Amino acid sequence: MFANYHTHTARCHHATGEDKAYVEAAIQNGFQVLGFSDHCPWIFSDGYVSPIRMTPDELDGYVTSLTALKKEYAADITIYIGLESEYVPEMLPEQQKFLQDYPIDYQILGEHFLYPEQRGIYTGRPTDNAAELKHYVDQVIAGMETGNYLYLAHPDLFHFIGDPVLYEQEFRRLCVYLKEKQIPIEINQLGLADHRQYPNPAFLKIAESVGNTAIIGCDAHHPSALLDIDSQQACKKLTEQYHLPLVEVFPQLSR
């Protein structure tokens, strides 16, 4: 792989490893570009503290550490400072205000929740609720329409186990939108390696028929994920099997 834009750090409280170890693993495996995109902090008005993302107080250290690594390894690899974030409309203004003074190169949209996290409605849990599926697709499209996000992480995270006709209808709508906007779909290495419900063959068949492009995201939660050549090759084989041209460079990011 030439590039990976989906990399976490220990600050999200469910990843492990030093920041430098991720960089050195990427260099060892021949990456030319490494984008960090740890789970973005949210400002919870009720004082809730998320166990699965960095806290607002940790963002300074994240940016400081990665800025230093950018300089230290400039001759070996291009490093970007990004964030993975949900699009939750009622919380977005406060988040944008909080982030505006930080040198964030990009964000990717990872829609793990459709509502503020403390409500506990995770989109990866099995459901046959058609209204929730439509809400997921509507909200992802609305999020991408803001222009805040480089691409959509694990688009097939939503674990719909209901009517396959509805699944095809709604995810086709999403794939058509992404194609029109020239946004690649992510083939998620973590999901593949961990035998999760994604990458989902049903979703990939839809993407193939629509003519989407794809990007491979390591979704690294440990430096070793960047060295998992077998899983990376398996992801690449999926792009070939479903005839999804691979995207690895984004012109809007300067090197």
List PLM regions with ranges:
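An N-terminally biased module of ancient metal coordination in phosphate/nucleic-acid-related enzymes
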Residues: 1-87, 99, 161, 165-175, ...
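Short amphipathic alpha-helices and their capping/turn segments at secondary-structure boundaries
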Residues: 19-32, 90-104, 136-146, 173-176, ...
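Active-site gating loops and adjacent loop-to-helix segments of metal-dependent hydrolytic enzymes
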Residues: 39-57, 103, 108-125
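Short helix-capping segments at alpha-helix termini
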Residues: 71-77, 210, 242-244
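Hydrophobic alpha-helical segments and helix pairs
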Residues: 77-122
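Domain-core and long-helix interface of multi-subunit machines
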Residues: 108-210
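Active-site core of metal-dependent hydrolases
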Residues: 184-193, 217, 221, 232, ...
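Mid-to-C-terminal alpha-helical segments outside catalytic/metal-binding sites
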Residues: 213, 229-255
